């Protein structure tokens, strides 16, 4: 029963695709109503057939609790910004109107939450600067433990231009969280960022030059994965950064690795400078020859080379077409044109009628003075140049010599970064309602994974429980991308229709074809199938009656004798002969 409804739904989908292609709005509305009715009927039939099946278990939210040592963890389920400090700073070199960090933050549930009671930190404003930060339980020191940073982001309204990255603020004596701004020193910046069609997942760390003490930003290579979906699907995604003491790093989204590498080899610019550099004082010698080819100095221009010959010459074989109007101009003043009333000859000059095509030239091959057409000059050679040969004095492309880099250093442990003591969000966004949740910083991978399972894992399970059926997902996708209707028809409805057509449309073999399989004489084939079957049935009954009478008479005439077997075999042979002539054997075989 359910299969029939699905088939009906596929047929309706095909109808909707055709109507959508025609572009009639009223018809499209009717089709949507039909689709809703069919979907409701399918759901009713499913509910009846699955009445004995227990409903899917409802996911109940419970705030995650760290299962081990953490430097920071916050699920925001207490419902307040306790522990977080809003910035009161102003951005430098910015107009006063937009220099303030006056963007609003709130702790609230997601607008379309599947987990009642699950709250998070929400960036509420658009086109404003936002800054908020919180102290760690204790500073993180880069020694023998890995660093694992993890948090969740949901772009509830999508994202036009803005970021959702975190900054791990360096431990300094000057650090004041209420003055947190864009130039506050940080150790690591990590998280998603997007503007236009540029989708990024930042991992930046500030490396201290051991010789000069100057900090320089080092950027990880761009991930190979396509990041667009994480910004557009309006789902909660889990971002994880793992830094190991052996300088390796991993970046994960939803617990799947999207980028990995080594701090020594996969950062731009590199952590360690080159041992040698080009000598800035070196200069190319004046006689240095970088020309790989030169003109042949021994080549001589041929005596018959005419450099003055034109590239085009008149075609001497051309003749003027008959009927050419030499005395008629190609264009004439428009006789119907009149000088505008506001024409001022002192200001505008003498008025002249606009030129139009001479109507007399329309029926003639041409007008005006006839000139021979130009053709390529077969004797044209152009300016003579000597051929090019290899330069015997070629010395290659000059490069300055290499000298030892006076600023060279070698840091083989870039993992040992500046300790940090706070986490902060310093963001500008053109989109509001960005949802953050379940921040955790730890040195234990197991603790972070448990936190993810108890937080993000519940969101994922709740989303799966509330996920619509396959049919509804197809309909929702087609609403966003109308061209999918055509795909549905070609990949689903059309093959199903062809299979049904193939299976249900049997084709009878004609009697004439069946008769080709035997040499026995056969009656003429009737045009009507019904008459043939009726005649066969009647002949069969007559033959059976004759056979019964024959057997009865034979039994009365012949007594029981010692040659009983011989007598019994005779009626049997006659019976076989009659059966061979019976119309039963002439009935066509059914497929």
From Swiss-Prot:
Modified residues (Phosphothreonine): 561
Membrane topology: Single-pass type I membrane protein
Disulfide bridges in this chain: 161-195, 361-367
Residue segments, region P domain (Extended arm): 277-410
Tissue specificity as recorded in UniProt: Expressed in sperm (at protein level).
Main location: endoplasmic reticulum
The protein's assembly and partners: Interacts with MAPK3/ERK1. Interacts with KCNH2. Associates with ribosomes. The palmitoylated form interacts with the ribosome-translocon complex component SSR1, promoting efficient folding of glycoproteins. Interacts with SERPINA2P/SERPINA2 and with the S and Z variants of SERPINA1. Interacts with SGIP1; involved in negative regulation of endocytosis. Interacts with PPIB. Interacts with SMIM22. Interacts with TMX2. Interacts with TMEM35A/NACHO. Interacts with CHRNA7. Interacts with reticulophagy regulators RETREG2 and RETREG3.
Protein name per UniProt: Calnexin
Gene that encodes the chain: Canx
């Amino acid at each position: 029963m359910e299969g029939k409804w699905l088939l009906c739904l596929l047929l309706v989908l095909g109808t909707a695709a055709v109507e959508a292609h025609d572009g009639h709005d009223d018809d499209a509305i009717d089709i949507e109503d039909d689709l809703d009715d069919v979907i409701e009927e399918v759901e009713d039939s499913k509910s009846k057939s699955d009445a004995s099946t227990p409903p899917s278990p409802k996911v109940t939210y419970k705030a995650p609790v760290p299962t081990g040592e953490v430097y920071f963890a916050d699920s925001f389920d207490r419902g307040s910004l306790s522990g977080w400090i809003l910035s009161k700073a102003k951005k430098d070199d910015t107009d006063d109107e937009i220099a303030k960090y006056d963007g609003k933050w709130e702790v609230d549930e997601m607008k379309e939450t599947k987990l009642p009671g699950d709250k998070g930190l929400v960036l509420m404003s658009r086109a404003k600067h936002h800054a908020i930060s919180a102290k760690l339980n204790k500073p993180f020191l880069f020694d023998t433990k890995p660093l694992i940073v993890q948090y969740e982001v949901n772009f509830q309204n999508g994202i036009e231009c803005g970021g959702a990255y975190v900054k791990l603020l360096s431990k300094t004596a000057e650090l004041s969280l209420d003055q947190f701004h864009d130039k506050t020193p940080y150790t690591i910046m990590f998280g998603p960022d997007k503007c236009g069609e540029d989708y990024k997942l930042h991992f930046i760390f500030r490396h201290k030059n051991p010789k000069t003490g100057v900090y320089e930003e080092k950027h990880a290579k761009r991930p190979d994965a396509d990041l667009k979906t994480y910004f557009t699907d309006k789902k909660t995604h889990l971002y994880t950064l793992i830094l190991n003491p052996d300088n390796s790093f991993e970046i994960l989204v939803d617990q799947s690795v999207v980028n990995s590498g080594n701090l020594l080899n996969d950062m731009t610019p590199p952590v360690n400078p080159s041992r040698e550099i080009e000598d800035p004082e070196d200069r190319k010698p004046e006689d240095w020859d970088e020309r790989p080819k030169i003109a042949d100095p021994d080549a001589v221009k041929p005596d018959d080379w005419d450099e003055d010959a034109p590239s085009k010459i008149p075609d001497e074989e051309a003749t003027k077409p008959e009927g050419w109007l030499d005395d008629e101009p190609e264009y004439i003043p428009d006789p119907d044109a009149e000088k505008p009333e506001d024409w001022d000859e002192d200001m505008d000059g003498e008025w002249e009628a606009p030129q139009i095509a001479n109507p007399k030239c329309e029926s003639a091959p041409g007008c005006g003075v006839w000139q021979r057409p130009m053709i390529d000059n077969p004797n044209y050679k152009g300016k003579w140049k000597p051929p090019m040969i290899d330069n015997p004095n070629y010395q290659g492309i000059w490069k300055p010599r290499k000298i030892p880099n006076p600023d060279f250093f070698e840091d083989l442990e870039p993992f040992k970064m500046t300790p940090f003591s706070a986490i902060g969000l310093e963001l500008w966004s053109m989109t509001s309602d960005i949802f953050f949740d379940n921040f955790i910083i730890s040195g234990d991978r197991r603790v972070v994974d448990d936190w993810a399972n108890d937080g993000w894992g519940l969101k994922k399970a709740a989303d799966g429980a509330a996920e619509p059926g396959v049919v509804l997902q197809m309909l929702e996708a087609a609403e966003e991308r109308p061209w999918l209707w055509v795909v549905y028809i070609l990949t689903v409805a059309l093959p199903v229709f062809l299979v049904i057509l193939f299976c249900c449309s049997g084709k009878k073999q004609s009697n004439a074809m069946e008769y080709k399989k035997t040499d026995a004489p056969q009656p003429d084939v009737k045009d009507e199938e019904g008459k043939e079957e009726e005649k066969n049935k009647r002949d069969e009954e007559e033959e059976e009656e004759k056979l019964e009478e024959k057997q009865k008479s034979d039994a009365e005439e012949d007594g029981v004798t010692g040659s009983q077997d011989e007598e019994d075999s005779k009626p049997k042979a006659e019976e076989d002969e009659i059966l061979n002539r019976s119309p039963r054997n002439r009935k066509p075989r059914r497929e």
